[in-house]
Amino acid sequence: MVFTISRKSMSQKLSLLLLVFGLLWGLMLLHYIFQRPRHQSSVKLREQILDLSKKYVKALAEENKNTMDVENGASMAGYADLRRTIAVLLDDILQRLVKLENKVDYIVVNGSAASTTSGTSGNPVPLTTNKRVKASGSIR
């Protein structure tokens, strides 16, 4: 009889512990869902990068117009070099974004393939193809 009473008490303690653990887990999940930052899509990020670079180049051009003398052609050569450098940097940034997108797509496909119950899928194919915007052509 004493053994059944202690078993019931242990069962109640265990259920209370599981209830508290579930409640804490649910609260942490809600906190993560509502507090995590919202990520912008890569298309919007690309557009922002290109727009900001165009504004930067225009601002440099205006600054060079204001400070450039008629005989000073060296500043225009520097401007062209700067513009090429920015184009190369933007192209590198966009290539890295595309690689990151492909990795994320691959992980998403693998995750969804692992969660399916059919198990008939062999090698998953990424959802998107490698579509790359050529940044250097649009800036020059």
From Swiss-Prot:
InterPro entries from the UniProt entry: CCDC126 (IPR042759), MGT5A-like_N (IPR027833)
Glycosylated position list: 110
Q: Which domain of life is it from?
A: Eukaryota
Give the region (Disordered) as residue ranges.
114-140
Task: State its location(s).
Answer: Secreted
What Pfam families does the database record attribute to this sequence? MGT5A_N
Q: What is this protein called?
A: Coiled-coil domain-containing protein 126
Q: Which organism is it from?
A: Bos taurus
Q: Organism classification, top ranks?
A: Eukaryota, Metazoa, Chordata, Craniata, Vertebrata
| Name of the gene encoding the protein in the UniProt record | CCDC126
